[in-house]
Amino acid sequence: MKKLLSIVILSTTLVGCIQKEIVDDVNLETGSAYDYMGGKIRGTALIPFYLSDKTVENKTFSASSNLSRDFLRDIQRQSSDPLVTGSLKVVLFGERLAKEKGILDLIDSFQRDPSIGARLYLAVTEGEAKSVFKGKYGERGNAIYLSNLIRHNMKSKDVPRTDLQRFMVDFNQKGKSPYLPRIKKLDKENVEISGLSFFRYGHVVDTIPADKMFYFKLLVDKYSQGTLKVDIGKEAAAIESIKSNYKLRLTSRKPLIVQINIQVKAILNEYSGVKITQGKIKKIEKKLEDDIEVECEKLTKRFQSKKTDPVGFGHFIKSKTRGFNFSKWETDYKDLKVNVQADVSITESGVID
């Protein structure tokens, strides 16, 4: 028994040593960035080096190629230890690459890599993607900061949920187009989500600014905690949406008409006027309903003009139509009429007298 116990202890000790040696002898790639430069794609790997004073040095290695597999091979030649992708948290695509070259081939390579998780965050950058990695954000490394930034804004702010898996589902699902958050570098220590980029056949065809993300999220996500300013004459109110849901209805086939019902329960956080009453709250609710209806309908018309369908009207109508013809839908989509009806309820307020 003592001999068996000694073997178990020795085996456990050896396993612990082996794992430590493996971790110590590799470079863990936590972020990737891709740009279109000089007719080739430049790939950049972000490697965190943890220093003795508990700070993180963000090291980057870059290589240019036309094949995604060549990036890793060429970057390996620059790295002192083997480079592994199993810890990849975020991938950034430069603006020019996303518009001119497209990103499908790159995304496909990530999807085929069994070491990369499906929950990998993707984003488009304003300007070069590599320059975003050149900053210093937070104390845990740039990749962790950027992935947390995206996750936080999806969970409790205005960015609709998306990742590697959702992007590929939307792309492969006929009648729905993918979208990604857009990241802007402000300075060496700060970045922000500046909007959303929308795709058609793997290329960015449109971008909306951050102040329109609230309305888009209402169209595609069943939960939103975004904040919004509502102007009532000379006064203003700060609204926080704590819960929302939407439902699509096909109300007519000839002509094609889809109605979107959006329900929002909100909290009134702040009011610029002297006194807030129930009557004024009703006016705020009505104003917000009007804003949602107008802005959401503007977005759907915008998407139609760009021939992108991030709301998924094509997929929805297909589910309601026997023998649906997607070739015909390509023509019919531009003539689709969308009516948005909003129902807003302010459930509580800390500023009512």
Residue ranges and their predicted role:
Residues K2-D353:
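Membrane-proximal alpha-helical signals and transmembrane carboxylates
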